[in-house]
């Protein structure tokens, strides 16, 4: 999926954070945004994944303007692991990861065997399958981050937005994450790993 930003501008309290940012990422392209703390990297990503609406400019997913799409439509195309995840879920790990399947469901549609298979595969990918029945709130910060990544993988989108995804991860799991997205194997989450 191609993600395009055109002339994105965002300001807070009379301070211009983003000034005319334009970029394009092509299908299956791995893109990194670098810069010092406070330079607007997360602000740009929040515009891309709909948390912020830019003061000016637009974001396009495969040529379609993001804010003209329904939230469900954009969630079928793009999953997000945000920099800060403040969740106090009283759900099991498996239930949290199942939330990633929501964009593919009709209202009140029940989870099926395929959903559980996708969730189990996502948990295995992030090495959290042994925690499937644990309550999310009992996990460490790094374990929670891996569950949120599994939820994004279970969403099975063609784009995955990661904002400082190694936050809270120990070095072993930082390396695992980097290998997951830089290995020569297909990164299409719709294919089995």
Task: Give the predicted meaning of each segment.
Residues 181-186:
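Conserved small/polar residues in nucleotide/adenosyl-binding loops
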Residues 57-65, 74:
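Conserved ABC transporter NBD signature motif
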Residues 34-36:
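The feature captures the beta-strand-to-loop junction immediately N-terminal to the Walker
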């Amino acid at each position: 999926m191609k993600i395009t930003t055109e002339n994105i501008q965002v300001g807070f309290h009379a301070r211009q954070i983003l000034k005319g940012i334009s970029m394009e990422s092509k299908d299956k392209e791995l893109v990194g945004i670098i810069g010092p703390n406070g330079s607007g990297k997360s602000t740009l990503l929040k515009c891309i994944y709909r948390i912020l609406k830019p003061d000016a400019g637009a974001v396009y997913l495969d040529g379609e303007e993001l804010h003209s799409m329904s939230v469900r439509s954009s969630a079928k195309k793009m999953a997000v692991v945000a920099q800060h995840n403040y969740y106090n879920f009283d759900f099991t790990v498996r239930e949290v990861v199942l939330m990633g399947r929501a964009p593919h469901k009709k209202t009140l549609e029940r989870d099926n065997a395929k959903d559980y298979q996708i969730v189990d595969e996502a948990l295995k990918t992030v090495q959290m399958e042994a925690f499937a029945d644990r309550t999310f709130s009992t996990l460490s910060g790094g374990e929670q981050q891996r569950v949120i990544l599994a939820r994004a993988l279970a969403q099975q989108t063609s784009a995955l937005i990661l904002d400082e995804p190694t936050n809270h991860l120990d070095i072993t799991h930082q390396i695992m994450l980097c290998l997951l997205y830089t290995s020569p194997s297909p990164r299409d989450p719709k294919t089995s790993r």
